[in-house]
Swiss-Prot record:
This is Probable butyrate kinase. It is found in: Cytoplasm. It comes from the Bacteria. GO terms for cellular component: cytoplasm. The keyword Transferase applies. One of its GO terms (biological process) is acetate metabolic process. It comes from Bacillus subtilis (strain 168). InterPro entries: Aliphatic_acid_kin_short-chain, Aliphatic_acid_kinase_CS, ATPase_NBD, Butyrate_kin. The gene is buk. It catalyses: butanoate + ATP = butanoyl phosphate + ADP. Keywords: ATP-binding, Cytoplasm, Kinase, Nucleotide-binding, Transferase. GO terms for molecular function: acetate kinase activity; ATP binding; butyrate kinase activity. Its main location: cytoplasm. The lineage of its organism: Bacteria, Bacillati, Bacillota, Bacilli, Bacillales.
Length: 363
């Protein structure tokens, strides 16, 4: 009889704008992780982000060689997914159609587009599979949830899919259940804040944490009064880019307090800064209110609420949110995020036969 759970060795790749994080995992256990920093001058040699893939791939292979890691022992390479067409969650084989969309920048140019391309190149050379897991374009929203109130605008699913899904599985396991059988609310709280309604393995509703929807966050404005925003847009004082920056980049804590660092805000509060306390409380209030709305989407059948991301390290912040929502359901806290491990887990589920890999299709 074939043993499904023999040890697998997985290379994980997470490209950022000026760095590439890599990890080598034995099943879920990390045996090597490193952030490869890329010199700005080196990157500026390339006209497009996508042209960096050979340079970054070589940097990864050189680093593994220096560490004495035998790449011929890898069972799979798994990368952070890029800006693709909307797809349901899961672990996807990096196929020709995906490479085509990543290289052409179908849904935009972003460093994460390099992940699948590099993974495929390394994996093909070793004759092993390459995957991506739960990219930001995961879209499982119900048709009802996509209605905005204006026929010209449809609500979009853009959220921290990789961490939300990984943490949801972890929470389900801690409760002795399967993610695919649970109804839960996952709240990722980092530079952006997204609250996902997880209904038996699918995120059927979630706020767009990038382009101004939901609670304000350390550097994003979230939902703001629409009429007043229109007035700002047509005041003649701001360009389109400046308005977008107010929504994403200089909004939220940064706009009110001059910093997007939650640790610094907590220090300001401890030092007696009443404005900092007030704004921090307002952010907790908005997060809690959005969680309340998410519970209505599940008709109150909420088996767990999970708080995750960098802000979940803030004990006073978490405590403030709990005070509003602990009547709804049990609140579990998993601070931070581990994208490399989440990628390894996604590949492992397929390698061990717990899940089927999915195929990306251009229709």
């Amino acid at each position: 009889m074939k043993v499904l759970h023999d040890e697998k060795r997985i290379l994980t790749i997470n490209p950022g704008s000026t760095s590439t994080k890599i990890g080598v995992f034995h099943n879920e256990r990390s045996i090597f992780e490193k952030t490869l920093r890329h010199n700005i001058e080196e990157l500026q040699r390339f006209d497009r982000i996508i042209d960096q893939y050979e340079f970054r791939k070589n940097h990864i292979l050189e680093t593994l060689h220096e560490q004495g890691i035998n790449i011929s022992k890898f069972d799979a390479v798994c990368a952070r997914g890029g800006l693709l067409r909307p797809i349901e969650g899961g672990t996807y084989v990096v196929n020709d159609e995906m490479i085509e969309d990543l290289k052409s920048g179908y849904a935009g140019q972003h460093a994460s587009n390099l992940g699948g391309i590099i993974a495929r190149e390394i994996a093909d050379g070793l004759n092993i599979p390459s995957y991506i897991v739960d990219p930001v374009v995961v879209d499982e929203m119900s048709v009802l949830a996509k209605v905005s109130g204006m026929p010209e605008i449809e609500r979009k699913s853009i959220f921290h899919a990789l961490n939300q899904k990984a943490v949801a599985r972890k929470a389900a396991a801690s409760l002795g259940k399967r993610y695919e059988n649970m109804k839960m609310i996952i709240t990722h709280m980092g530079g952006g804040i997204t609250i996902g309604v997880h209904d038996r393995g699918r995120v059927v509703d979630v706020n767009n944490g990038l382009h101004g929807e939901g609670p304000f966050s350390p550097e994003r404005a979230g939902t703001v009064p629409a009429g007043d925003l229109v007035d700002l847009c047509f005041s003649g004082e701001y360009t389109k880019e400046e308005i977008m920056k107010k929504l994403v980049g200089t909004g939220g804590l940064l706009g009110y307090l001059g910093t997007n660092d939650a640790v610094k805000v907590e220090q300001m509060i401890q030092g007696g800064d009443e404005k900092a306390r007030f704004i921090y409380d307002a952010m907790a209030y908005q997060v809690a209110k959005e969680i309340g709305a998410a519970s209505a989407a599940l008709k109150g059948e909420v088996e767990a609420i999970v708080l995750t991301g960098g802000l979940a390290y803030g004990k006073s912040f978490v405590s403030a949110i709990r005070s509003y929502i602990d009547w709804i359901s049990d609140v579990l806290v998993y601070p931070g995020e581990n994208e490399l491990q989440s990628l390894a887990q996604g590949a492992l589920r397929v390698l061990q036969g717990e899940e089927q890999s999915k195929q990306y299709r251009i229709e």
